[in-house]
């Protein structure tokens, strides 16, 4: 599916909004949602860290892994993976601003880690790597932004070695009929649309050649994430010319969209 938004729109969005999101989402530059359990309570950043841990556990990532981080943003998770797992990671992102941030942040890491990590500007639909380059493809809060999703899934499959693992989360559209509010504050605001529900996404993955090892509907965790973010942004007041108030309202609308079945979130573990 190719939507009305372009990769250039997405690149411009994240180039311009990075500082705002850092100021209340995560000052280290991470930008994804969280998995809430007894260990996290209602702490949003703990829930984000728990999602990272859960994905590592499910994907079986060890120090021999060669990981492609698809949509790496500011490189925060890639550096966490390298530090925590001792693996090699290459991160790609459309945003030149965020890739520059990642490359700069890497210079502050130990020299040994710098030899195992790298970041480059690239599109998920045209990956600059040979076939079978990676043991794992990892992605968080990214593929919904890719306007040719089938191409991105094919490219992820291509660069994985035989038996390699794709582990990722993505937004889904549980039903095709959505309200004007959901269109405005969810889909148009985030410059995306998707043909996939939680179930039909699995069909697309199978059609690409993946075996589905596990699929988990995380929509309740998406709702909890935006409930937290609405409060955090709202508490910022009128800083950034009222941007926080706008975001807090939009996040409340996203909570409502999840409640109404107009927005979902899934985690997928697949094997080539």
Where are these regions (language model features)?
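N-terminal auxiliary segments of SAM/dcSAM-dependent transferases
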Residues: 1-23
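Class I SAM-dependent methyltransferase SAM/SAH-binding core
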Residues: 66-70, 74-126
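A short glycine-rich, Lys/Arg-flanked "PGG" loop and its adjoining helix->strand segment in the class I
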Residues: 150-165
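Short, glycine-/aromatic-enriched active-site segment of Class I SAM-dependent methyltransferases
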Residues: 171-192
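Conserved Class I S-adenosyl-L-methionine
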Residues: 214-272
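A short acidic, Gly/Pro-enriched loop at the edge of an enzyme's catalytic core
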Residues: 125-136
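Short alpha-helix
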Residues: 193-209
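Conserved alpha-helix/loop element of class I SAM-dependent methyltransferases that forms part
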Residues: 27-37, 42-63
């Amino acid at each position: 599916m190719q939507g009305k938004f372009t990769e250039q729109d997405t690149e411009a969005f994240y180039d311009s909004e990075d500082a705002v999101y850092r100021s209340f989402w995560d000052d280290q530059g991470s930008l994804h949602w969280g998995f809430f359990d007894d260990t996290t309570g209602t702490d949003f950043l703990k829930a984000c860290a728990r999602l990272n841990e859960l994905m590592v556990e499910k994907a079986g990532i060890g120090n021999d892994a060669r990981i492609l981080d698809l949509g790496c943003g500011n490189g925060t998770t890639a550096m966490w993976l390298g530090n925590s797992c001792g693996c090699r990671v290459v991160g790609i992102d459309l945003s030149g601003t965020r890739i520059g941030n990642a490359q700069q942040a890497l210079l502050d890491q130990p020299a040994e880690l710098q030899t195992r990590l790298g970041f480059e500007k690239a599109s998920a639909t045209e990956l600059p790597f040979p076939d079978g380059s990676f043991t794992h493809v990892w992605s968080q809060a990214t593929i919904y932004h890719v306007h040719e999703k089938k191409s991105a899934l094919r490219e992820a499959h291509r660069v994985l070695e035989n038996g390699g693992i794709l582990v990722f989360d993505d937004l889904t559209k549980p039903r095709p009929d959505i309200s004007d509010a959901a269109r405005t504050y969810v889909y148009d605001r985030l410059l995306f649309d998707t043909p996939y529900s939680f179930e039909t996404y699995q069909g697309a993955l199978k059609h690409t050649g993946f075996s589905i090892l596990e699929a988990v509907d995380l929509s309740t965790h998406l709702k909890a994430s935006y409930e937290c973010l609405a409060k955090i942004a709202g508490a910022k007041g009128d800083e950034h010319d009222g941007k926080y108030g706008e975001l807090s309202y939009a996040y409340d609308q996203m909570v409502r969209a999840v409640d109404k079945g107009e927005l979902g979130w899934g985690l997928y573990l697949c094997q080539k």
